[in-house]
Swiss-Prot record:
Pathway in which this enzyme or protein is active: Purine metabolism; AMP biosynthesis via salvage pathway; AMP from ADP: step 1/1
Family the entry assigns: Belongs to the adenylate kinase family.
GO MF annotation list: adenylate kinase activity; ATP binding; zinc ion binding
Source species of the chain: Acidiphilium cryptum (strain JF-5)
GO BP, one annotated term: AMP salvage
Region listing for LID, in residue ranges: 126-164
Comment block on domains: Consists of three domains, a large central CORE domain and two small peripheral domains, NMPbind and LID, which undergo movements during catalysis. The LID domain closes over the site of phosphoryl transfer upon ATP binding. Assembling and dissambling the active center during each catalytic cycle provides an effective means to prevent ATP hydrolysis. Some bacteria have evolved a zinc-coordinating structure that stabilizes the LID domain.
Keyword Membrane: no
Residues reported to bind ATP: 10-15, 127, 200
Keyword Aminoacyl-tRNA synthetase belongs to the record: no
UniProt-listed Enzyme Commission number(s): 2.7.4.3
Protein name (record): Adenylate kinase
Length: 224
């Protein structure tokens, strides 16, 4: 099972990738996490990425693809992988296809989580976390049991990410649509794109993803 999960910020890609990882024993690969791990480990690619980031520039596709190549060689990818939110552009998609072919990986399916933009703004702008233990909450969908008190540790201190503000979220969605929209026909022409309603309940979204994978002929890996 080698798949890509696409969708705008707040569509639930990370949540669904984690569910599929736990259920089928495949590796969830989020490029941001991978990049931070490489930088922290001080690998050759990590050092190159750190130098680029410290200069204020964007890490090149070549570096990201190189990191992905290394990541896919690790044992937890033996049953397959889920790429969470990558690629974002057609050049990235083309470079990814080339690298996967070189490494003898077949890309089975690309799942697009489609969510209404007004819902996305509400989902993202309502998020907050406990400043003490990091537990995540939402004003509407997952409030604390007792207002102002963390369910897990009892702290009264909470934080919100600056880029979760409604106006910032709207700007991120504009950027996503401008940058990522062209890769949808790229994968559709290859017969790999499958659209799933990301506005349903979490379990229903998972079921729809699994249904799309079955229709695509993707066999679930055997789990120990």
């Amino acid at each position: 099972m080698n798949i890509i999960l696409l969708g705008p910020p707040g569509a639930g890609k990370g949540t669904q990738a984690k569910i599929l990882q736990d259920r089928y024993g495949v590796a969830q690969i989020a490029t941001g996490d991978m990049l931070r791990a490489e930088v922290k480990a001080g690998t050759e690619l990590g050092r190159a990425a750190k130098a680029v980031m410290e200069s204020g520039a964007l890490v090149s596709d070549e570096i990201i693809i190189g990191m992905l190549r290394n990541r896919l060689s690790q044992p937890d990818c033996r049953n397959g992988f889920i790429l969470d939110g990558f690629p974002r552009t057609v050049p990235q998609a083309e470079a990814l296809d080339t690298m996967l072919a070189e490494q003898k990986f077949d890309l089975d399916a690309v799942i697009l989580l489609k969510v209404d933009e007004a819902v996305l703004v509400e989902r993202i702008s309502g998020r907050f976390t406990c400043a003490h233990c990091g537990a995540g909450y939402h004003d509407k969908f997952h409030p604390t049991g007792v207002p102002g008190v963390c369910d897990k540790c009892g702290s009264h201190d909470f934080v919100r990410r600056p880029d979760d503000k409604a106006e910032v979220v709207k700007d991120r969605l504009v950027a996503y649509n401008a940058q990522t929209a062209p890769i949808l026909p790229y994968y559709e022409q290859k017969g790999r794109l499958h659209v799933v309603d990301g506005m349903a309940a979490m379990d229903q979204v998972t079921a729809e993803i699994e249904g799309a994978l079955r229709r695509a002929g993707v066999a679930a890996p055997a789990t120990a």
